[in-house]
Regions:
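Long recognition/docking surfaces used for binding and targeting
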Residues: 213, 217-308
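Structural motif
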Residues: 27-33, 195-209, 273, 292-295
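Active-site metal-binding core of divalent-cation-utilizing nuclease and nuclease-like domains
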Residues: 24-27, 50-91
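Conserved S-adenosyl-L-methionine
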Residues: 317-346
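Short, hydrophobic/amphipathic alpha-helical patches that form generic packing surfaces
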Residues: 36-43, 207-219
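Nucleic-acid nuclease catalytic cores
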Residues: 102-151
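Short amphipathic alpha-helical segments and their helix-coil junctions
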Residues: 4-23, 180-199, 282-284
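Acidic-basic catalytic patches of nuclease active cores, encompassing PD-(D/E)XK
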Residues: 2-59
Length: 346
């Protein structure tokens, strides 16, 4: 999901597109970039290219259906070429997945509630899945009926089944979580959740450090047991109660702070002061992310963002960019047993 290299987007379904990867600001990705990434992900899960329908009409409204509700794409249980009409009922009768893509996470809950969930309500089959994809969150939605009551459930991307199989809720493992392009954006979203929960800035950064150390501790614990369930999970999607979730996560926090505490500049509490609902929302973002395999520049950018706030350091300088470091190492070509030092002399 990187923005490096050629700025042209090549879609597995439509070929090379006229839209670039980057938006007008030159820094962030376009919505089309994320749509193609979602398509590539599903193809990697065995969903046939010929079964994709780009921008299908999901519902028609108004006089003679003049207004329409579209999704970014749908995956059908038959080749799209076999559907001779663009009528919503014909498409929805074969829809396996309906996807909505956004370029950022700013209105994620609004989009989920007004676009993704209604798409599932319009679906003809109970087995149809909804997919939400943005720069931070990738979530799958499905319908469950219990005692005649329908409920739309939500879970991490790892729940998406291979083509032809039903959805199955399985715990996250070290081998199923993935690094992200921006830890900064991920933790800014977590900071926003804490802000909405009325935590002051200083307390928010303390909680973020607790969460970061706990996540790293958990990943290291399961790195050599890659197929065993992690202790930091998207517990709501697994049907775990809020009280049980708080206890499970709280136990890991205590062990993590005990392990890392003596290496921290300041004493850090080993009690996480979060309500069940707030913890659920944070775990939804944090649990699917693999931090310890993130690239150096991703970790560096994150560190410079949050370390200053955590420890009130006056950082007048920035780390040497990793591109410069890599360039110099390539030129110097150190051999076994040799070391290169960056004296940080300004």
């Amino acid at each position: 999901m990187e923005l490096t290299g050629n700025l042209q987007i090549v879609c597995p379904i439509r070929g090379q597109l006229k839209v670039n990867k980057r938006s007008k600001d030159g820094l962030t990705a376009t919505e089309e970039f994320y749509r193609v990434e979602a398509i590539k992900f599903l193809i990697s899960k065995g969903y046939p290219k010929e079964n994709f329908w780009i921008e299908p009409i999901i519902k028609k409204f108004g006089n003679s259906g003049r207004n329409s509700f579209r999704s970014d794409f749908a995956v059908l249980d038959v080749p799209a070429s076999t559907i001779s009409t663009n009528e919503p009922d014909d498409i929805l009768g074969h829809a396996v997945i309906i996807c909505e893509v956004k370029r950022d996470n700013k209105k994620n809950e609004y989009v989920k509630n007004t676009q993704v969930k209604p798409m599932l309500d319009f679906a003809k089959k109970q087995s149809t899945l909804g997919l939400y994809w943005d720069n931070i969150e990738k979530r799958v939605f499905w319908i469950e009926v219990t005692d005649g009551i329908k409920e739309i459930k939500e879970g991490p991307l790892t729940f998406v089944p291979k083509f032809g199989l039903p959805i199955k809720t399985t715990p996250l493992t070290f081998n199923t979580i993935e690094p992200v392009d921006s830890l900064t954006e991920t933790f800014e979203r977590i900071e926003d959740i804490l802000h909405q929960a009325s935590f002051a800035p200083e307390k928010r950064y303390e909680i973020i450090l607790q969460l970061l150390l706990t996540k790293i501790f958990d990943e290291h614990a399961f790195e050599v047991r890659g197929d065993e369930p992690l202790e930091i999970q998207d517990y709501r999607s697994l049907g775990t109660s809020a009280d049980t979730t708080k206890k499970k996560v709280g136990d890991v926090v205590k062990r993590a702070i005990s392990f890392y505490g003596e290496h921290l500049p300041n004493k850090l509490s080993d009690t996480l002061p979060l309500s069940g609902d707030t913890l659920f929302e944070i775990l939804k973002i944090l649990a699917p992310v693999k931090i310890i395999h993130s690239k150096r520049d991703v970790v560096q950018t994150f560190y410079m963002k949050f370390a200053k706030a955590l420890y009130k350091w006056d950082m007048a300088q920035y780390f040497t960019p990793t591109t410069v470091t890599d360039f110099l190492v390539d030129i110097i070509n150190p051999q076994f047993g040799e070391h290169i030092a960056d004296p940080a002399c300004g």
